[in-house]
Amino acid sequence: MRALLLVSLLLMSCITHAQTPEATVRDFYHFYLTDFVADNHENPLNSAKMQQYVAKETLTRLKTIQDIEEQEIVDADYFTYCQDYAAEWIPALDVGTARDDAGGKVLDVWLGIQDGKKLKLRDYLRQEDGNWKIYRVVDVSNGFEQNIFDDNAISAARAHAATLSQH
């Protein structure tokens, strides 16, 4: 009986430490934007923090695309849809309420940008290793998505890169 009670308490403590999708996204963007503006010249895709917040498949695809010479699949930062970001914009971060979506969650994110404006993104999350992780980000403000999940585009980019190395 004591063993059952101990196991129950242990399971309850694990459950209470699991983050909500909203907390995951908020924590991710606080970390990521701070790192983005620091520009420490390290590849953030390799960091343990990224593995904590971003789905494995997404990180793998971003690394694959990043290694393709002159690729045109990702033309801005995938998680911000920006080329640059200013530290003074970070406090304007706002995260919406998660909604169910195809077995995962989706929520809106507003990033502060120049002139006090906001850029609206939509983050898609799924459970991985018992945690909510970001696997897809869409720029809602501009109706645009960097198609990192398009295998044909990745193959075409690789083929194009191969022709560049022949010259």
Regions flagged by a language model, labelled:
Residues 54-117:
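Surface-exposed, charged secondary-structure patches
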Residues 13-15:
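N-terminal signal peptide c-region/cleavage motif recognized by signal peptidases
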Residues 33-67:
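Short, solvent-exposed secondary-structure junction/capping segments
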Residues 1-4:
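Positively charged n-region of N-terminal signal peptides that target proteins for export
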Residues 101-105, 115-122, 128-129, 135-167:
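Low-complexity, intrinsically disordered terminal/linker segments enriched in charged
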Residues 20-37:
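Short, aromatic-enriched amphipathic alpha-helices that serve as compact interaction elements
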Residues 21-25, 46, 153:
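Stable alpha-helical elements in mature extracytoplasmic
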Residues 20-21, 41-42, 113, 117, ...:
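Extracytoplasmic/periplasmic, Sec-exported soluble proteins
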